[in-house]
UniProtKB/Swiss-Prot annotation:
This is Cell division suppressor protein YneA. InterPro entries: Cell_div_suppressor_YneA, LysM_dom, LysM_dom_sf. Coiled coil: none annotated. Inhibits cell division during the SOS response. Affects a later stage of the cell division protein assembly, after the assembly of the Z ring, by probably suppressing recruitment of FtsL and/or DivIC to the division machinery. Belongs to the YneA family. Keywords: Cell cycle, Cell division, Cytoplasm, DNA damage, DNA repair, Septation, SOS response. Residues 39-90 form the LysM domain. It comes from Listeria welshimeri serovar 6b (strain ATCC 35897 / DSM 20650 / CCUG 15529 / CIP 8149 / NCTC 11857 / SLCC 5334 / V8). GO terms for cellular component: cytoplasm. It is found in: Cytoplasm. Its main location: cytoplasm. One of its GO terms (biological process) is SOS response. HAMAP family: YneA.
Length: 109
């Protein structure tokens, strides 16, 4: 069989397989590209989402209201209620937290 005969007989299958491969690669790159390595913050007694936004919103380049809305959505929080001992993901890349200030003083210390 020559290539022309193979193409004439199986062109639909060949195009389908190539399309699936391309879409699979695009999907894989998209999924791997969205692993943003966002930071996780532990909630202490008396903390609120707005207090966390006051501290971290400037590092995320978001207004505080958008920051709080993002945290509520991504952490499945209802009405922004958090309790001590919880941890929430915030839209600040880990590298921005590491580069910002090497000495962090906790509120309860």
């Amino acid at each position: 069989m020559t290539l022309k005969l193979i193409w004439d007989k199986f062109y639909v299958s060949i195009i389908f397989v190539i399309t699936c491969l391309v879409l699979g690669i695009v999907l894989m790159c998209t999924v791997l590209g969205n692993s943003n390595n966002y930071s996780e913050v532990n909630i202490n007694e008396g903390d609120s989402l707005w207090a966390i936004a006051d501290e971290y919103a400037s590092k995320s380049d978001m207004p505080k209201a958008d920051f709080v809305a993002w945290v509520e959505k991504e952490n499945n929080l209802t009405e922004g209620h958090v309790k001590a001992g919880d941890s929430v993901v915030i839209p600040v890349h880990e590298t921005k937290l590491q580069n910002s200030d090497s000495t962090i003083q906790l509120a309860n210390q």
